[in-house]
Curated annotation (Swiss-Prot):
Its EC number is 3.6.1.-. Pfam families: Cpn60_TCP1 (PF00118). It catalyses: ATP + H2O = ADP + phosphate + H(+). Mg(2+) binds at residue 104. It is found in: Cytoplasm; Melanosome; Cytoplasm, Cytoskeleton, Microtubule organizing center, Centrosome; Cytoplasm, Cytoskeleton, Cilium basal body. Belongs to the TCP-1 chaperonin family. This is T-complex protein 1 subunit delta. Keywords: Acetylation, ATP-binding, Cell projection, Chaperone, Cytoplasm, Cytoskeleton, Hydrolase, Methylation, Nucleotide-binding, Phosphoprotein. The modification Omega-N-methylarginine is found at residue 19. It comes from Homo sapiens. The keyword Phosphoprotein applies. Component of the chaperonin-containing T-complex (TRiC), a hexadecamer composed of two identical back-to-back stacked rings enclosing a protein folding chamber. Each ring is made up of eight different subunits: TCP1/CCT1, CCT2, CCT3, CCT4, CCT5, CCT6A/CCT6, CCT7, CCT8. Interacts with PACRG. Interacts with DNAAF4. Interacts with DLEC1. The keyword Chaperone applies.
């Protein structure tokens, strides 16, 4: 027994000595991890800094398959970036969160987070504890939201001019900015058609379908009150149906097939003839039942098991003057039903007249040489939905136009959610910096120091805007500070004229929700990165 004890005590002593050394060595580790996380996250923020604002640059992104995307939308750039570091990935998630919450300001939110992290580095190097920094940042955030809310002015949804200005400001920083005079009214009209301005508190953007069609230019984009389908009409003879009765089926109009492991053996031609006769009678019966309900436009869901529509069925439908559109995607069905008031039918026995939707006109429109579209307009019981048709000379332009329209729609959605506007052009951030610096003087000790650092970090937005517009960032931000100190709350960077002016007179406005959401999400992310002191890899 005693001989067993001796080594144990030795081991304990060794372990204690080892632990002492380990504790000494590991004391630096949390700080190293923190700095590593901060520098990785800052690298992501620096990567998209140049794409902020109307004079920001675009990024060309090539994926593994060789597909190219050209965009300056922060969320899109970060989504497609290959980010390995877990802390850097948090900034990608941050941008996604801002995209979901507000839909705009996805670049700003990451830049603000990067700047706050930069301030954290300086504070940590001075030996301030991460928890103190984190709590001070939370205080600064609460005060910041108050300041932004004070700066904002209420807006009514009936004030169309203001809504247009907000949408135009959002579109001005995009590749398609020269078309903002067309796309802004289109976005405003689309949102206003799908909500009741008096009672709405949010907008479901799924009610606004964006259909992309190659060919033409962005000038050819249009807003359609009704349904637009890119699928071709299957029977060539019928391209226009007035007083349309529209049915939507989820079963196939073709001969039934046997199960996978069954076979039918046909031994002579008389039996073959009988099989064909049966098939003909079966399909004719299906088509007659469809015709009996008064249906004259038939939409057929895409089927992967067998032909959704056989040639024989198409022949009969053609004879009965029924327009047929096949290969309707499963995910479009809900939108189609809401738009034209039809109900999907899974079996022929349920195909009755009350399942049909009705519309004034279903017409296949020829797009002078670049394909065809099917438009169904004048729906009798329209749900509140609209379709935006986006045209463009190539895939890159169309996709960027779609993203830009989505951002403009999101800006108007923000105004529906929170009916307040704030100036753009870096004005709110400079005001924040100024007022938070004043606020920091009322605090004592380390808190005051940390809030001051938070305030200084806010200046990154006007500084980046000035830099991207080719102005001198230091002199521009200094002048802005002076103007705000003299009480000009709405002085901001006028990128078009290359100077500082009252940004509200230039109609550069953004929803309050975008700024508040960006500030809140950026601060939350920075606080979580600060609190991390170790990264553990698991198998």
């Amino acid at each position: 027994m005693p001989e067993n004890v001796a080594p144990r005590s030795g081991a304990t002593a060794g372990a204690a000595g080892g632990r002492g050394k380990g504790a000494y060595q590991d004391r630096d580790k949390p700080a190293q991890i923190r700095f590593s996380n901060i520098s990785a996250a800052k690298a992501v923020a620096d990567a998209i800094r140049t794409s902020l604002g109307p004079k920001g640059m675009d990024k060309m992104i090539q994926d593994g398959k060789g597909d190219v995307t050209i965009t300056n939308d922060g969320a899109t750039i970060l989504k497609q970036m290959q980010v390995l570091h877990p802390a850097a990935r948090m900034l990608v998630e941050l941008s996604k969160a801002q995209d979901i919450e507000a839909g705009d300001g996805t670049t700003s939110v990451v830049i603000i987070a990067g700047s706050l992290l930069d301030s954290c580095t300086k504070l940590l190097q001075k030996g301030i504890h991460p928890t103190i920094i984190s709590e001070s940042f939370q205080k600064a955030l609460e005060k910041g939201i108050e300041i932004l809310t004070d700066m904002s002015r209420p807006v009514e949804l009936s004030d169309r001019e203001t809504l247009l200005n907000s949408a135009t400001t959002s579109l001005n920083s995009k590749v398609v900015s020269q078309y903002s005079s067309l796309l802004s009214p289109m976005s405003v009209n689309a949102v206003m058609k799908v909500i009741d301005p008096a009672t709405a508190t949010s907008v479901d953007l799924r009610d606004i379908k964006i259909v992309k069609k190659l060919g033409g230019t962005i000038d050819d984009c249009e807003l359609v009150e009704g349904l637009v389908l890119t699928q071709k009409v299957s029977n060539s003879g019928i391209t226009r149906v007035e007083k349309a009765k529209i049915g939507l089926i989820q079963f196939c109009l073709s001969a039934p097939k046997t199960d996978m492991d069954n076979q039918i053996v046909v031994s002579d031609y008389a039996q073959m003839d009988r099989v064909l006769r049966e098939e003909r009678a079966y399909i004719l019966n299906l088509v007659k039942q469809i015709k009996k309900t008064g249906c004259n436009v038939l939409l057929i869901q895409k089927s992967i098991l067998r032909d959704a529509l056989s040639d024989l069925a198409l022949h009969f439908l053609n004879k009965m003057k029924i327009m047929v559109i096949k290969d309707i995607e499963r995910e479009d069905i809900e939108f189609i039903c809401k738009t034209i008031g039809t109900k999907p039918v899974a079996h022929i026995d349920q195909f009755t007249a009350d399942m049909l939707g009705s519309a004034e006109l279903a017409e296949e429109v020829n797009l002078n040489g670049s394909g065809k579209l099917l438009k169904i307009t004048g729906c009798a019981s329209p749900g509140k939905t609209v379709t935006i048709v986006v045209r463009g000379s190539n895939k890159l332009v169309i996709e960027e136009a779609e993203r830009s329209i989505h951002d403009a729609l999101c800006v108007i959605r923000c105004l529906v959610k929170k009916r307040a506007l704030i100036a753009g052009g870096g004005a709110p951030e400079i005001e924040l910096a100024l007022r938070l610096t004043e606020y920091s003087r009322t605090l004592s000790g380390m808190e005051s120091y940390c809030v001051r650092a938070f305030a200084d970090a806010m200046e990154v937005i006007p500084s980046t805007l000035a830099e991207n517009a080719g102005l001198n960032p230091i002199s521009t931000v200094t002048e802005l500070r002076n103007r705000h100190a003299q009480g000009e709350k709405t002085a901001g960077i006028n990128v078009r004229k290359g100077g500082i002016s009252n940004i509200l007179e230039e109609l550069v406005v953004q929803p309050l929700l975008v700024s508040v959401s960006a500030l809140t999400l950026a601060t939350e992310t920075v606080r979580s990165i600060l609190k991390i002191d170790d990264v553990v890899n698991t198998r």
